[in-house]
C-alpha cells in the first residue's frame, strides 16, 4: 500500500491502538476569502462518512469506547483514532471513509459553521488571542500562516457544502501517511492494505507546494500591531518568522526557546516574574511548522508595569544576538530539550503523530535521536550565530487599553528610531 504510507510504532500498552492519518492540506491552504475552510472541513469529517450518518458514526465509535476526531493544523489535517485492539478491524476503515467519502450533510455544515463562529466570537474577548491574531497578520499578511486555523468569522459565514466539496475531493490525491502505535497485531499490518476502504487508494501526487498559497503574502513594512481592548492586563508578543522544521539552524533556536521559556528556571520567568514581578504569564513560542515558524516571546502585565515589561522583553531579545549563552545555561537548555522530547512521546497517540509529522515533512524517522546526538556539538557561539541570522527584525503585537497602547507605541518608536 503506497498511499497512504503505513508506519508502525510498537509500544507496550494494555491492548490500546492509536492511529494517525495525516493529509498534507492544512489551514495554510485555505483559499483566499475562505479562511477557516479546512478547519470546518476537519470538523465535518467525523460527522458522517460512507454508510454512516453523524448519529450512526457516533454510536459506532462511542459504543466501542473509542475516540475519533480530525484536527486542522497549519500544515495538515490529522485524523485520529484511539481504540482497543479488538475493535481496530472494524474502526480503522472509518479513517479511509472520512477521507474518501465524507458526507458533508448541509445540516451538519450549518451546525459546525455556527459552532466555529461562536468559538471565534468568544476568542475575541481573550486578549492573548487578539494579540496572537494581530501578530500573525502583522508578520504573515494575507499568506497561509496569517490567520488562526479556525479562520475568520466573516469569511466562514459564507461557506457551505458547495464551497467545501473541492477541498474534500482532493484529500485522497496527495501523499498521505498512516501511523499505528501501541499494541499493533500482525494481522492488522498484513491486512490493512486489503481492507475495502483502503484498496485502490489513488497514488499520491507528492507534497510539492509549488502553485499553492505562500506562507506570507502582502506583508507591510509596519513593525507594530495594536489591538485596543477594555481589559485589566496588557499582552505583549515580540518575535519574528524564522525557519521550517528540519532546518540546520532549528536545533539552536530550539535550545534558545528552552532557555527562554521552559520551566521556572527559564530566563523569561526569572527576569520578568522573579526579579521584577511585572508579568502574570510568560512563554516562548516556536512551533514545528513546514514553513517559516514564529519565534515569539509572550508576556502579560498590568498596565502600570507594562512599559517595564516591554523594556525587559526587548533587552532579552537583543541579548540573544549580542552575547552568547554561558556553558551552564546551554547545558541546562540541552537537558530541557531532551525532557521536552520525552514529554511529547509519552502516549501512543503522541508517538503516532510524531511519526506522521516527520514523514510528511520529509525528515528521517530518527530525526529526534539525531538532534539529541547533535546537542553536544552545539557551542554557545553556534547558538549566537543562529540568533544573529534569524532574530534581528522582531515585530510587536500588543493588546490592552488605548492608554497603555499609546505609551507602549511611543516606547517602540524610540527603539525604531535608535
Language-model features: locations:
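Active-site-flanking structural segment that lines cofactor/substrate pockets
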Residues: 28-29, 54
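Charge-rich, well-structured scaffold segments of protease-associated domains
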Residues: 56-209, 215, 243-244, 275-418
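His/Glu-based metal-binding/catalytic segments typifying zinc-dependent metallopeptidases
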Residues: 7-27, 35, 177, 202-269
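Short, Gly/Pro- and small/polar-rich lid/capping loops
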Residues: 1-2
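Active-site SXXK
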Residues: 37-47
